[in-house]
């Protein structure tokens, strides 16, 4: 029995996982967590459990663990990967190696943030006023817009098939905002990678 959480679709940064493994009959013999990509397998967690007592009555029958997978630390490439949990019990079957339980989960490694840049050049904004910016995003962008301090003004696609990735955004600056209030273009992809970049404007 193996339970692993969470089960993300994407891996963009260091993520913490919790694992529960159990075998009520023979008890646990070994546990291994690994991530495989293009034939290259990297071990994340590996643990063995000794046979103790009559019929392993004093052995480990349930184990909980927490671990982190960081794609940068493990030098994972961009693209598909398979997260694997392999478990053996103390059964005499399988030539004495025990019964094997294999749990797998497919995910995509994506650590590259989306690209975004302004197409319009001059953006003059009065305090309490609004402005329009036209900008371009990369194809992996899911959400985008303008951040005025902590307020997000969402952008909308404007290019259609002729100019994919082109967006417009109407944004406003509060009347009591400081002259140096940060105004940034913002984009996020499916994996949760974010880009925040300045563009020419004057409040």
Describe each model-derived feature in a short phrase.
Residues 88-97, 188-193:
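Short, solvent-exposed loop/turn segments at the edges of extracellular beta-sandwich modules
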Residues 2-4, 113-119:
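Proline-enriched interdomain boundary motifs that mark the N-terminal boundary
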Residues 1, 103-112, 202-203:
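Flexible, low-complexity linkers/stalks enriched in Thr/Pro that connect modular domains
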Residues 23-47, 138-150:
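Solvent-exposed loop/turn segments flanking beta-strands in beta-repeat/beta-sandwich domains
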Residues 51-70, 161-170:
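Aromatic sugar-binding surface patches on proteins
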């Amino acid at each position: 029995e193996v339970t692993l959480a969470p089960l993300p679709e994407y891996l963009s940064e260091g993520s913490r996982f919790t694992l529960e493994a159990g075998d009520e009959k023979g008890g646990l013999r070994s546990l291994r967590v690994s991530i495989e990509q293009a034939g290259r397998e990297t071990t994340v967690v590996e643990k063995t459990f000794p046979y103790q007592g009559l019929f392993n009555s004093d052995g480990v029958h349930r184990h909980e663990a927490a671990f982190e997978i960081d794609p940068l630390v493990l030098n994972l490439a961009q693209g598909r990967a398979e997260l694997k949990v392999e478990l053996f019990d103390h059964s005499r079957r399988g030539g004495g190696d025990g019964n094997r339980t294999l749990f797998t989960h497919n995910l995509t490694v994506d650590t590259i943030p989306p690209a975004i840049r302004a197409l319009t050049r001059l953006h003059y904004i009065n305090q309490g006023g609004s402005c329009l910016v036209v900008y371009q995003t990369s194809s992996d962008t899911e959400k985008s817009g303008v951040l005025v301090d902590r307020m997000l003004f969402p952008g909308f696609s404007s290019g259609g098939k002729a100019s994919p990735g082109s967006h417009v955004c109407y944004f406003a600056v509060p009347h009591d905002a400081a002259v140096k209030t940060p105004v940034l273009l913002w984009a996020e992809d499916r994996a949760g990678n974010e880009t925040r970049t300045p563009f020419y404007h004057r409040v």
